[in-house]
């Protein structure tokens, strides 16, 4: 009887023959497919890079042929660097949120109330992750609006088409991540996420870290390399 209960308990974790939880395997397969998607989008951007006939251009100043008005290079690297830093810090907050849930019910070892709170408050860290993700999206919305105001849209030239498609897809993924983490935050506030729920937070964390890694590639290839 005890043996049967043990088998039932082990089976409830849904492990594959490799010892990996089915839910984690599913997210890794999904991330693999997303890698191929972004690889194709980045490749398309690189193929068309520098082939736009008319401006605006990413790294070169240009003059509007109709008005004669001169414009600087359209990419604002300092502003985007700030948004990139915010997104990277959100990954740290996500790590802290997962650690807080996994250690729930265990002594934190912190000597102060503040230290104990920061080590055990998954709600705080989930909120900070969502906030920083939303801040990144706010920066992206500002950037898109500025580009359109300066004459760059998805139909303007090859750069505009490939840029808006690539960064727009990434922004959509970040939006989905913020909604996902916001849902986990709501659940945590309602009933409290326990160590047994950590796998779901871990899956969300894998997705969030993937979004960050993709953005590092985009930021490097689009903004930094001229």
Question: How would you name each of these model-derived features?
Answer:
Residues 1-226:
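...captures the hydrophobic TM-helix bundle architecture rather than a specific catalytic motif
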């Amino acid at each position: 009887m005890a043996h049967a209960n043990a088998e039932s308990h082990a089976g409830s974790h849904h492990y594959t023959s490799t010892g990996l939880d089915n839910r984690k395997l599913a997210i890794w397969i999904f991330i693999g497919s997303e890698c191929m998607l972004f690889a194709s989008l980045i490749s398309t951007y690189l193929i068309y890079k520098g082939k736009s006939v008319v401006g605006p251009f990413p790294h070169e100043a240009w003059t509007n042929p109709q008005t004669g008005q001169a414009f600087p290079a359209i990419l604002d690297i300092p502003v985007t660097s700030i948004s990139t830093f915010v997104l990277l810090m959100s990954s740290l907050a996500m790590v802290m949120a997962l650690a807080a849930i996994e250690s729930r019910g265990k002594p934190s070892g912190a000597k102060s109330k503040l230290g104990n709170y920061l080590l055990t408050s998954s709600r705080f860290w989930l909120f900070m992750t969502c906030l920083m993700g939303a801040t990144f999206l706010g920066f992206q919305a500002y950037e898109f609006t500025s580009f359109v105001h300066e004459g760059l849209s998805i139909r303007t030239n090859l750069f505009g088409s490939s840029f808006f498609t690539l960064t727009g897809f990434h922004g959509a993924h970040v939006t989905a991540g913020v909604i996902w983490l916001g849902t986990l935050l709501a659940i945590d506030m309602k009933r409290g996420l326990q160590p047994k729920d950590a796998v779901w937070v871990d899956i969300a964390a894998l997705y969030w870290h993937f979004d960050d890694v993709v953005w590092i590639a985009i930021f490097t290839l689009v903004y930094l390399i001229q």
